[in-house]
Regions:
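Hydrophobic membrane-insertion alpha-helices, especially the h-region
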Residues: 1-11
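A structural signal for short, hydrophobic/glycine-enriched beta-strand patches
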Residues: 11-166
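A transmembrane-helix-recognition feature enriched in membrane-embedded lipid enzymes
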Residues: 162-181
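Short, Lys/Arg-enriched, disordered terminal segments
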Residues: 1, 89, 121, 180-181
């Protein structure tokens, strides 16, 4: 029992620390990881990720934005399409947005976005997601050979969702470590 508690504390600490210390570095691209879409529109979590990606883009951190996410249950369009629509409405030229609309989970987000990077001769990226999600994203980027930095968001107005996401991330990180042993 003590070992289980210790493992949970260690994993939780890794997630929190990485989310807090992550700093974006200028890169060729910005990858925004998908999240639930309501109908055709991004949910508050996804909007916050998009706003962070947009901020980085406008500040010159990356020339291209890769939006990553398939169409999930109850969604009218793919997460990538909803993200592209949102960014275009915010003034981003469509030619600087690369759609990756096949991924259904974080591993596929990273793998399929890497392929889009290769197809477009991009060598580095900033990964944008919620802070609790970044540690696992970092491990997956390392595994896939993506040169990346990270920028995380925290949606205070949806604290219960942030807490649930953080709690889900602990076993997800544990599963990742077990699978890669």
């Amino acid at each position: 029992m003590i070992l289980v508690i210790l493992i949970i504390i260690i994993l939780a600490s890794k997630i929190i620390y990485f989310g807090i210390k992550s700093q974006p570095q200028k890169s060729d691209s910005i990858i925004i990881l998908g999240c639930k879409v309501k109908g055709n529109d991004p949910t508050p979590f996804l909007r916050r990720r998009l706003d962070e990606g947009l901020r980085l883009y406008n500040e010159g951190y990356g020339k291209y934005i890769i939006v990553s996410g398939a169409k999930g249950p109850g969604e009218n369009i793919s997460e990538a399409e909803a993200m592209q629509k949102y960014l275009v409405q915010k003034g981003v030229d469509k030619k600087f947005i690369i759609l990756e609309d096949k991924s259904r989970n974080t591993l596929e987000n990273i793998k399929f976005s890497k392929k889009k990077m290769e197809d477009n001769n991009l060598s580095s990226s900033i990964i944008v997601s919620n802070k609790y999600h970044l540690k696992r994203a970092e491990l997956l980027c390392q595994k896939e050979g993506i040169k990346a930095s990270y920028s995380g968001v925290f949606v205070r107005s949806h604290m219960s969702h942030e807490i649930m996401g953080f709690l889900r991330e602990i076993p997800a990180l544990l599963v990742y470590y077990i699978k890669t042993m």
